[in-house]
């Protein structure tokens, strides 16, 4: 039986960011990409991903914002995660100011991606 891998993209990314990884990993694992575009908080994103995941247990990979969601999944359903990969994210807790900014960007991304891009570009 193939292992299950659940990939979580970053803010302003969708499944296409993992196209090549899905193609390569599909030879050895069942791979799916979580949709992080449908909720307004990290907690809600994690709940949505867990509800929609086809596998009961999986290796979880979080990229950027996906890493924050992965940590929330680890807090809420650790029994479902058999391995964790974090990329371009942080394990340090956000300050309350940083957390509020991130949550506002997630909420804004649901309605106005251009505005999110305008806010993030100067930070690059």
For each of these PLM feature ranges, what is it?
Residues 3-10:
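Short beta-strand element of the alpha/beta-hydrolase
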Residues 62-66, 70:
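Gly/Ala-rich beta-loop-alpha elbow adjacent to hydrolase catalytic centers
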């Amino acid at each position: 039986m193939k292992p299950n891998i659940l990939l979580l993209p970053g803010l302003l990314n969708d499944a296409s960011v993992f196209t090549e990884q899905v193609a390569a990993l599909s030879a050895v694992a069942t791979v799916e990409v979580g949709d992080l575009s449908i909720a307004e908080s990290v907690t809600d994103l994690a709940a949505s991903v867990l509800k929609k995941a086809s596998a009961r247990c999986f290796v979880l990979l979080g990229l950027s914002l996906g890493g924050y969601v992965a940590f929330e999944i680890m807090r809420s359903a650790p029994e479902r995660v058999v391995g964790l990969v974090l990329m371009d994210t942080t394990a340090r807790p956000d300050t309350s100011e940083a957390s509020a900014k991130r949550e506002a960007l997630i909420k804004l991304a649901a309605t106005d991606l251009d505005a999110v891009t305008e806010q993030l570009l100067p930070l690059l």
